From Swiss-Prot:
Membrane topology: Single-pass type I membrane protein
Protein name, as recorded: Transmembrane protein 210
Chief subcellular location: membrane
GO annotations of cellular component type: acrosomal vesicle; membrane
Region (Disordered): 128-147
Phylogenetic placement of the source organism: Eukaryota, Metazoa, Chordata, Craniata, Vertebrata
Cytoplasmic side stretches: 69-147
Extracellular side: 32-47
Chain intervals with Pro residues compositional bias: 133-147
């Protein structure tokens, strides 16, 4: 039979204590008896430990992803390493733009409607308007100060 801590020495609440408790529950699940109780059944404790292990694994994976991102960011700022990149107001941007022709075909378009039938925007129906620039009106006087 595996030795088990007394009820007053049970680690209540700490993740390390729950992991240690899970090591104590392994012999308990094999048919031995353990006096240590946190007010939860053995199945509930095992489920809690599984959930904590999953959360720990997720946090570890997130930490690895952040660490890789930091190492890559540090690698891009090496003074001897130069690439075709510009630092703009929205972060690092490529200095060349690759534009590809995109052909868009609409299935909602009327097949009888031809592009040549569309009126040109440069037609006689459109004219340019010029507006004279006027100086802005003076600002209103400030309100009198209360006395």
């Amino acid at each position: 039979m595996a030795p088990c801590p007394q009820p007053e020495s049970c680690p209540a609440g700490s993740p390390l204590g729950l992991i240690c408790l899970s090591l104590l529950l392994i012999p308990a699940s094999a048919g031995t008896y353990c006096e240590c109780s946190l007010g939860l059944s053995r199945e509930a404790l095992i489920a809690l430990i599984v959930v904590l292990a999953g959360v720990s694994a997720s946090c570890f994976c997130a930490l690895v992803v952040v660490a890789i991102g930091v190492f890559r960011a540090k690698g891009d700022t090496c003074p001897g390493h130069s690439e075709n990149r510009l630092v703009g107001p929205y972060g690092v941007q490529e200095d060349r733009i690759d534009l590809h022709t995109v052909h868009v075909e609409s299935h909602l378009m009327d097949p009888d409607l031809d592009v040549s039938m569309m009126p040109s925007l440069d037609g006689p129906g459109l004219m340019t308007m010029t507006a004279p620039l006027e100086p802005p009106p003076p600002p209103p006087p400030p309100p009198p100060l209360p006395q």
